[in-house]
């Protein structure tokens, strides 16, 4: 099954938007546009770029809008117009939203995954990543099958620096402060749907599929 929908997920770190995106990407043949993945790929390919933004990522701060906008826009230009995609982690600021509108990056639906702060901290403290393929796991929600090794390439799994408790708290505050005007904009547009991210990933996916 293929979808040509242009979808945005809004949700705090730990809301499950990345994992849910990957489930839908595989099922509906969508392109997954994750700013986190784009940054990690660019960092691995460009040492000058890595030095430029590493401090932002390790501290849980947002990378300057002009850098993020260019990275996302350059990626979207490569996607065929009739191809559906999921935006995950963008836009995060009003300036990024304005850039989207100005550059004709249109959306069919927006899903806002609402979740309590204590749930976020609990989930992120259990999150692990593969250093080689960047696949993510969660010891609460999506456990690796082989201990603490990646299911795909058997590489040791690690905890990211920005999943430390003190960084998580900062990321939550940053998200809550920046998301309000973005949610309000899409509320007026009539394309936003609110989801309870406290439920299981499977339940959330079933809800989303009603709109696809």
Curated annotation (Swiss-Prot):
GO BP annotations of the record are: AMP salvage
Domain remark from Swiss-Prot or TrEMBL: Consists of three domains, a large central CORE domain and two small peripheral domains, NMPbind and LID, which undergo movements during catalysis. The LID domain closes over the site of phosphoryl transfer upon ATP binding. Assembling and dissambling the active center during each catalytic cycle provides an effective means to prevent ATP hydrolysis. Some bacteria have evolved a zinc-coordinating structure that stabilizes the LID domain.
Extract the coiled-coil ranges from the record. Answer: none
Residues involved in AMP binding: 35, 40, 61-63, 89-92, 96, 160, 171
The gene it comes from is adk
Tell me the pathway.
Purine metabolism; AMP biosynthesis via salvage pathway; AMP from ADP: step 1/1
Name of the protein: Adenylate kinase
Q: What is the lineage of its organism?
A: Bacteria, Bacillati, Mycoplasmatota, Mycoplasmoidales, Metamycoplasmataceae
Similarity annotation? Belongs to the adenylate kinase family.
Q: Which GO terms describe its molecular function?
A: adenylate kinase activity; ATP binding; zinc ion binding
Question: Annotated region NMP: where?
Answer: 34-63
Annotated region described as LID, given as residue ranges: 126-163
Q: Which SUPFAM superfamilies match?
A: Microbial and mitochondrial ADK, insert 'zinc finger' domain, P-loop containing nucleoside triphosphate hydrolases
Major site of localization recorded for this protein: cytoplasm
| Annotated EC | 2.7.4.3
Q: Which NCBIfam families does this chain map to?
A: adk
């Amino acid at each position: 099954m293929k979808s040509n929908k242009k979808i945005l997920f809004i949700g705090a770190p730990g809301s499950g938007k990345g994992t849910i995106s990957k489930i839908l990407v595989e099922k509906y043949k969508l392109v997954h546009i994750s700013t986190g993945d784009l940054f990690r790929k660019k960092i691995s390919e460009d040492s000058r770029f890595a030095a430029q933004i590493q401090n932002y990522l390790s501290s849980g701060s947002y990378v300057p809008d002009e850098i993020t906008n260019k990275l996302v826009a350059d990626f979207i230009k490569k996607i065929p117009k009739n191809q559906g995609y999921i935006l995950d982690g963008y836009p995060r600021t009003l300036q990024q939203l304005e850039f989207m509108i100005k550059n004709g990056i249109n959306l069919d639906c927006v899903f806002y995954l609402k979740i309590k702060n204590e749930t976020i901290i609990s989930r992120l403290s259990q999150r692990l990543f593969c250093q080689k393929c960047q696949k993510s796991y969660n010891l609460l929600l999506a456990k690796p099958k082989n201990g603490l090794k990646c299911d795909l390439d058997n590489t040791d799994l690690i905890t990211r620096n920005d999943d430390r408790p003190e960084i998580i708290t900062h990321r939550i505050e940053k998200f809550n402060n920046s998301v309000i005007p973005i949610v309000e904009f899409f509320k007026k547009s009539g394309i936003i749907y609110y989801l309870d991210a406290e439920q299981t990933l499977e339940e959330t996916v079933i809800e989303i599929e009603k709109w696809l």
